[in-house]
From Swiss-Prot:
Membrane topology: Multi-pass membrane protein
Cytoplasmic side stretches: 1-3, 63-68, 114-130, 179-198, 266-268, 314-330, 377-391
Name this protein carries in UniProt: Multidrug resistance protein MdtL
SS bond list: none
Keyword Nucleus: no
Gene from which this protein is expressed: mdtL
Topological domains, Periplasmic: 25-41, 90-92, 152-157, 222-244, 290-292, 352-355
Keywords annotated in UniProt: Cell inner membrane, Cell membrane, Membrane, Transmembrane, Transmembrane helix, Transport
Listed transmembrane segments: 4-24, 42-62, 69-89, 93-113, 131-151, 158-178, 199-221, 245-265, 269-289, 293-313, 331-351, 356-376
Main location (coarse class): membrane
A Pfam family the protein falls into: MFS_1
Organism: Shigella dysenteriae serotype 1 (strain Sd197)
Family note: Belongs to the major facilitator superfamily. DHA1 family. MdtL (TC 2.A.1.2.22) subfamily.
One cellular-component annotation, GO: plasma membrane
SUPFAM superfamilies noted in UniProt: MFS general substrate transporter
Length: 391
């Protein structure tokens, strides 16, 4: 079992590492490529676009051909793209490399969740996904620090060589440690089971909405945090970094505590708790009379996301034993595109950073609470863990 957990964690971590590792070198990258920092900030969106593009096909291929045939090319593409970015001499080539990096990371991301669906039952999967969420929260804190240390002695290209080394590690795990987990194709007489795993399942769609809104909340917070904390609340850059590190600490603590909570409370209870925390955060930020109260509201956001997201993702994947790859892709596409669309629309309409965050918090909590209470899970699908024996 440990081999599947290690490989899944490694496959997922390429995604946040690709986002956060290079940010510290952005000023030097812009100077060397004769581009403005503003022009290169689009590299974040280009990376997410690459991930979304990968998810359009990676899930289907993973369900038809297996998890390894997607993970191995995905890791290889991430390596090649990282090297390509390090060798880029124009901003156009750099952005092309970032898109390819996103493609590779997207393939690995989809496979990781499919593997967890293949090998774990519902309760254990919820616990593991909560732990994975906590580990993912470490990356935005550690990656810039590691990038800063690297750049003390080496040029910005070394950041992408470091990502390439990470990709090589994932490739080696995928080649030599990971075993195939895709369930055997059903017999012709059992095709009804595969056909019953519809993406239009009400329960699955409800969890797609809940997880997409939750990701929209956390990405809205990350996207608006410089404006909220430095421009509106007046904190210095160093204080901003400290606050963001503390919020990551809250996320990690809650994420690592959630598996223990799942041994006491039902998953539904934790999901309701998550949305109540979002609602409390929205109300707190809306009526806050002081910076201290506002910071408390921000910690509620991090706690709310960490306590509920892994559980919701596990529930979303639950109905799919034969189409876990497609289900994982659908979740990823919805989360990336839905959150990006909200942030873009809010900016176009002219909604301020503060109201943008409050609005998505309250909308997410109300819609999600209604879905949790009125859309019940269907009959659970078995088909996990015994898969190992024919891997």
């Amino acid at each position: 079992m440990s081999r599947f957990l290690i490989c899944s964690f490694a496959l997922v971590l390429l995604y946040p590492a690709g986002i956060d590792m290079y940010l510290v070198g952005l000023p030097r990258i812009a100077a060397d490529l004769n581009a403005s920092e503003a022009q290169l900030h689009i590299a974040f969106s280009v990376y997410l676009a690459g991930m979304a593009a990968a998810m359009l096909f990676a899930g289907k291929v993973a369900d038809r051909s297996g998890r390894k045939p997607v993970a191995i090319p995905g890791a290889a593409l991430f390596i090649i793209a990282s090297v390509f970015c390090s060798l880029a001499e124009t901003s156009t080539l750099f952005l092309a490399g970032r898109f390819l990096q996103g493609l590779g990371a997207g393939c690995c991301y989809v496979v990781a969740f499919a593997i967890l669906r293949d090998t774990l039952d519902d309760r254990r999967r919820a616990k593991v996904l909560s732990l994975l969420n906590g580990i993912t929260c470490i990356i935005p804190v550690l990656a810039p620090v590691l990038g800063h240390l690297i750049m003390l002695k080496f040029p910005w290209q070394s950041l992408f060589w470091t990502m390439a080394i990470m990709g090589i590690a994932v490739l080696m795990l995928s080649l030599f440690i990971l075993k195939e987990t895709r369930p055997a194709a059903p017999a012709a007489s059992d095709k009804s089971r595969e056909n019953s795993e519809s993406l239009l399942n009400r329960f699955f769609l409800s969890r797609v909405v809940i997880t997409t809104l939750s990701v929209s909340v956390i990405l809205t917070f990350v996207n608006t945090s410089p404006v909220l904390l430095m421009e509106i609340m007046g904190f210095e850059r160093g204080e901003y970094a400290t606050i963001m590190a503390l919020t990551a600490g809250v996320s990690m603590t809650v994420s690592f505590s959630t598996p223990f909570a799942l041994g006491i409370f039902k998953p539904r209870t934790l999901m309701i708790t998550s949305q109540v925390l979002f609602l409390a955060a929205g109300i707190t930020l809306a009526v806050s009379p002081s910076h201290a109260i506002s910071l408390f509201g921000i910690t509620l956001i991090c706690a709310g996301f960490s306590v509920g997201f892994g559980v919701a993702m596990s529930q979303a994947l639950g109905p799919f034993s034969l189409r876990a790859g497609v289900a994982s892709s659908t979740l990823g596409i919805a989360q990336v595109c839905g959150s990006s669309l909200w942030i873009w629309l809010a900016a176009v309409v002219g909604i301020g950073a503060w109201n943008m965050l409050i609005g998505i918090l309250i909308a997410c909590s109300i819609v999600s609470l209604l879905l949790i209470m009125f859309v019940a899970p269907g009959r659970p699908v078995a088909a996990h863990e015994e898969i190992h024996h024919h891997a």
